[in-house]
């Protein structure tokens, strides 16, 4: 149903003369991301919940071997999405939210800027491995200090690995009034 609806929406907009790119923001369901990549010009995925739901706390400790197995599971699921994006010239936004880091990342790095960066870099490395570079990045946190620190760390890590991608930084839950404007 989602597939036919998205296809119909895309076709209807194009038939009406609209050429604004469609962007899908997908959480918790990699299958939906696959379908969205067929009809949207850009799909946002969240590393914290792309394969597994974020913060389930079902597993609190990961050995190095278990950590590597989880990364392999992510890669195995991400490759079909990458291929769909390549075939359809669909861009990807890797959108990392401080509030939705995976249990695996939180176990290894804590609830830190380093965890945000690790989460993003894992996905960037997979995209690079499969020669897909139509990627933009967003880093978001409700804490401006965490967000700024995360972005600076991410830029440093990307530079170390020879990566350059457009980067959006955002403050979630900015609020209203003067506090919201300052954030």
Residue ranges and their predicted role:
Residues 14, 37-43, 155-159, 163:
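Glycine-enriched alpha-helix->loop->beta-strand junction motifs that scaffold or abut catalytic
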Residues 32-37, 74-92, 156:
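Short amphipathic alpha-helices and their capping/turn segments at secondary-structure boundaries
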Residues 6-17, 82-86, 151, 155-159:
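Surface-exposed amphipathic alpha-helices with a cationic face
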Residues 20-26, 43-45, 92-96, 135-139, ...:
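Hydrophobic faces of well-ordered beta-strands that scaffold small-molecule active sites
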Residues 16-17, 40-77, 104-115:
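Glycine-rich tight-turn/loop motif centered on a GG-T
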Residues 64-74, 106-183:
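Catalytic alpha/beta core domains of metabolic enzymes, predominantly
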